[in-house]
């Protein structure tokens, strides 16, 4: 990894956030967490290279947060990978049509998550 990428993990499940953060940091990423979409939206999201975003959360879903990000010129190009326990084609298509860069169904293997993160970041770097 040439530079340290910043990744934000947005998920309402604390053990999942902590586990992902640990694995990402062991792989050389800088990883921050937010327990909700509302909390994430208070951060300077432009400082991140990628967001791992759970779809099913409390007051605001990951889909709603992604729509806000894509509607804002400052964050419209920010790569998003959806994480969800709902593994339906309709959910996957909705997320990808909204502008997500990938979609990972829970439960997942960390190797799969790391490979997908790497692929999305490589594509994002080529677009810059």
Regions found by a protein language model. Give the residues of each.
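Acidic, metal-coordinating helix/loop segments flanking the phosphotransfer/catalytic sites
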Residues: 33-50
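C-terminal output helix
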Residues: 108-121
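The feature encodes the CheY-like receiver
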Residues: 17, 53, 58, 67, ...
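Two-component/phosphorelay signaling modules centered on CheY-like receiver
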Residues: 14-32
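Acidic catalytic/metal-coordinating carboxylates
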Residues: 35-36, 61-64
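Active-site residues of response regulator receiver
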Residues: 11, 54, 84
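His-Asp phosphorelay/catalytic-motif detector in bacterial-type signaling
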Residues: 4, 47-49, 74-79
């Amino acid at each position: 990894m040439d530079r340290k990428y910043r990744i934000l993990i947005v998920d309402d499940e604390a053990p999942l956030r902590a586990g992902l953060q640990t694995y990402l940091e062991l792989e050389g990423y800088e990883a921050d967490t937010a327990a909700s979409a509302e909390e994430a939206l208070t951060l300077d999201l432009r400082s991140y290279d990628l967001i791992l975003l759970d779809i099913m959360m409390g007051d605001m879903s990951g889909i709603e947060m992604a729509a806000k990000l894509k509607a804002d010129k400052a964050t419209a190009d920010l790569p998003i990978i959806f994480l969800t326990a709902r593994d339906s084609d309709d959910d996957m298509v909705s997320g990808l049509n909204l502008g997500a860069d990938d979609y990972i169904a829970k439960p997942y293997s960390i190797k799969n998550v790391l490979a997908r993160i790497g692929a999305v970041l490589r594509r994002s770097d080529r677009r810059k």
